[in-house]
């Protein structure tokens, strides 16, 4: 699962801040995935009884409330670091195009810090939750459908042959079956 989480996190970080996670052994990877998993548990329909039993909200010793506050502090720390890093790169003119930079540079957008943070949180938690689940589901599906794997392999071999690299920088996704398979898995 860490490789799938790294893919999800790298996609979210690249799209929103124009950076990637170097490896699944990095401290940033560990911190973000841990905190976002904990926050996801709080948002779960079964993970936080305080949402359904109001009396539990009055408990001053609630572990959930303390843990939620701790996760908020930790999340704010890495969000702040990612935002400062992007601000530095934008100031130097070395940033790559990304959602956050595009919104900041858009004179008509005029979003405040809270709105930018909301976009960032949506990209981060939404990406980790959905992409990770999606890729795991797709791998599970393919593991039970060797006929789909065989058809994809045959389509790739017909298109590229045995002497060409399958994943070149010039790949224009002309392999119709594989492109359709990916789109179907993304639904």
Description of each model-found segment:
Residues 1-135, 151:
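Cytochrome P450 heme-thiolate monooxygenase catalytic core
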Residues 30-38, 94-102, 141-187:
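Cytochrome P450 I-helix active-site segment
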């Amino acid at each position: 699962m860490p490789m799938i989480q790294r893919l999800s996190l790298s996609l979210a970080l690249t799209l929103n801040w124009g950076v990637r996670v170097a490896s699944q052994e990095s401290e940033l990877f560990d911190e973000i995935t841990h905190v976002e998993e904990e926050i996801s548990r709080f948002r779960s329909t079964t993970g936080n009884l305080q949402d359904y039993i109001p009396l539990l909200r009055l408990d001053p010793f609630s572990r959930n409330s303390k843990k939620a506050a701790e996760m908020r502090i930790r999340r704010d720390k890495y969000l702040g670091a990612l935002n400062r890093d992007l601000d530095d790169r934008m100031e130097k003119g070395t940033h790559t195009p990304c959602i956050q930079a595009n919104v900041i540079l858009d004179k008509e957008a005029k979003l405040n810090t809270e709105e930018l943070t909301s976009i960032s949180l949506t990209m981060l938690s939404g990406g980790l939750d959905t992409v990770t689940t999606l890729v795991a589901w797709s791998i599970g599906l393919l593991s039970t459908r060797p006929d789909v794997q065989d058809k994809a392999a045959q389509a790739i071999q017909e298109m590229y042959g045995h002497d060409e690299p399958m994943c070149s920088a010039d790949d224009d996704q002309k392999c119709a079956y594989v492109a359709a398979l990916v789109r179907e898995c993304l639904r």
